[in-house]
Swiss-Prot record:
It comes from Saccharomyces cerevisiae (strain ATCC 204508 / S288c) (Baker's yeast). This is Sedoheptulose 1,7-bisphosphatase. GO terms for molecular function: oxidoreductase activity; sedoheptulose-bisphosphatase activity. The gene is SHB17. The lineage of its organism: Eukaryota, Fungi, Dikarya, Ascomycota, Saccharomycotina. Induction: Expression is correlated with levels of ribosomal proteins, thus periodic SHB17 expression coincides with the peak demand for ribose phosphate that occurs during ribosome synthesis. Homodimer.
Length: 271
């Protein structure tokens, strides 16, 4: 009997020219490199066939960033699936999962950003920290925290529904380096909680086009104030779930995607 504890499987897109060089890639719509394509084909083979970490029958939704590099990664990872298996999985393009909007820092390296900010008279008292300071003419940490909190609320709402129906539910999220590390951090409560009060925070934003995904209105959201100190290289996979089978106890699965089969009695994360 499979575990009924839902999981959120986060997947960073494969290698691009800018992920290889370390340039900040937000709205720039780069494709995967040939290496990145092969990388994600191998990942799909590993998680679906060799490792058997993912059962296609348990995948209820895939949410993806609209950027080409993320959508290419979805297609490549799903290659091992049959047409019938693939047809049963709903793929939802969700603009809330786009990468951090870097503004003036798009295409730059970290050292170049630090020099630019220094030339503008910034960071005299403490060094730049994107998780706290955001990006000039791009997104603040509050703005990205708000939209990722919306995405998390929708996924956790779906998990709650599927669990109540007795269905196994793996939901996959394909996105980007900064966005997914931020997503993982606030999934289980890092950062600070802020009540939705401003027009931007309380407005109804539907960032996807799929009527099977219920809209969830936020009363509050979370945003970071420091680096969560997570690593997720291009092509990397992480696992988020819930402690004690309880949707109200979101947790990080430290073992990641390569785990021993759970004991039949404990099922998943029960102690």
């Amino acid at each position: 009997m499979p575990s009924l504890t839902p999981r959120c499987i986060i997947v960073r897109h494969g290698q691009t020219e800018w992920s290889k060089s370390g340039q900040y890639t937000g709205l720039t719509d780069l494709p995967l490199t040939p290496y990145g394509e092969g990388q994600m084909l191998r990942t799909g083979e590993s998680v679906f066939r060799n490792n058997q970490f993912l059962n296609p029958d348990n995948i209820t939704y895939i949410f993806t960033s609209p950027r080409l590099r993320a959508r290419q990664t979805v297609d490549l990872v799903l290659k091992p699936l049959s047409d019938e298996q693939r047809a049963k999985i709903r793929v939802v393009v969700d603009d809330d999962l786009r990468e951090w909007e870097y503004g003036d820092y798009e295409g730059m390296l970290t050292r170049e950003i630090i020099e630019l900010r220094k030339s503008r008279g910034l960071d005299k008292e403490r060094p730049w920290n994107i998780w706290r300071d955001g990006c000039e003419n791009g997104e603040t940490t509050q703005q990205i925290g708000l939209r990722l909190s919306r995405a998390i609320a929708r996924i956790q709402n779906l998990h709650r529904k599927h669990q109540s129906e007795g269905r196994a539910s793996d939901i996959m999220v394909f996105a980007h380096g900064h966005a997914l590390r931020y997503f993982a951090a606030i999934w289980f409560g890092l950062g600070v909680q802020k009540k939705c009060e401003t027009i931007e925070e309380i407005q109804n934003v539907k960032s996807y086009d799929d009527d099977t995904v219920p809209y969830v209105k936020l009363e509050s959201y979370r945003h970071l104030v420091d680096n969560p100190c997570f690593l997720l290289d291009a092509g990397g996979i992480g696992v988020l779930s819930y402690a004690h089978h309880n949707i109200d106890e979101p947790a990080l699965e430290l073992a990641g995607p390569f785990v021993s089969p759970p004991e039949e009695e404990s099922q998943h994360g029960d102690v």
